[in-house]
Amino acid sequence: MLNKEIGSDKKEESFFRSAFQKLKRIERPEKDKQKVPRDRSKLIAVTLWSCVGSLLFICLLAVLLSINTRSQLNDMKDETNKPTNDDKQKISVTAAENFLSGFINEYMNVKNDQESIEKRMQSLESYMVKQEDNHFEDEERFNVDGLKGDRELKGYSLYNVKEGDKNSLFQYKVTYENLYPVEKEVEKEVKDGKKKKKVKEKVKTNEKYEKQMLLNIPVTNKGDSFAVSAVPYFTQIYDLKGDIAFKGKEETRDEYAGEKKESIESFLQNFFEKYASEKKEEMVYMMKKPEALEGNLLFGEVQSVKIFETKKGFEVFCAVRFKEKENDIPVNEKFSLEITENSGQFYVNKLKHQ
């Protein structure tokens, strides 16, 4: 009886165990985790306002850039319309000289009579720049009241032209004579009865005094039209000769001393003999760009030859003495030559007068 109870207990235990195992095998469905949606309204608002702000900034920047570009274009137009120094320097000296030739004659020649003085004033005014406000001093600028003689132009030549901001200053070396009356005391023989006696008498004569000065004439132009912009004035003639030093290029190459040196020197001797005596057409076989003295000078000698070897041949520097064929007056000249050699024959590719 006891055994039966024990057996029934075991059966119940095994039943519960197997039921428990089956329950374990059954997968429990996972509970859905409900996500709470975030509040994105602030993020959207910030993004929208940022976009609006960016657009406003870009529009403002575009307006500023447009204004700046327009300002730069206007400046460029102004600069283009302004006359440059190059434009000012394009004054035709030849045309200006032709214009001034009549003015110089009118200005320099002065006659001591009222009709000539008035005619001179009118003529000179026709050369002047026209002023909107005609001042009294402009009307009187060529008045020569109070003169005591004449002035006569003997000759003139253009001395220099100086460019300025508003005009060009034409400087002419003028030679002229001032004629003026002088009262002198002279002795004269007069009859005194049967005898003659010397008496002193005052007479008026015209004296001449020659002068050389620089006549400075300010000139303005508009294209090929010219006008004198101010009253001319005189200055002393200055020396155009200047103390100008020229620094020559220092030669650092070694002179050629090879086996062809004597042949090159012999060629130079022959070349300059032909250069002095032959016609230009005859020099074709000796040089690329033919030139010649065609017998106007006689060849003397080649002096101080310096030869340098180059990739294409030789570069030669030399001094050559020619002379006048009528009286042997020497004429010295310096040359540089680029020489090439072909089959033992030398040829001048380039000749330069130094």
UniProtKB/Swiss-Prot annotation:
Q: Which InterPro entries match?
A: TcpC (IPR024735), TcpC_C (IPR035628)
Indicate how the chain sits in the lipid bilayer.
Single-pass membrane protein
Does this entry carry the keyword Transmembrane? yes
> A Pfam family this protein belongs to?
TpcC
- Compartments, record wording: Cell membrane
Q: Which UniProt keywords apply?
A: Cell membrane, Membrane, Transmembrane, Transmembrane helix
| Superkingdom, natural source | Bacteria
What are the GO cellular component annotations?
plasma membrane
Principal localization reads membrane
Mind telling me what this protein is named? Uncharacterized protein YddB
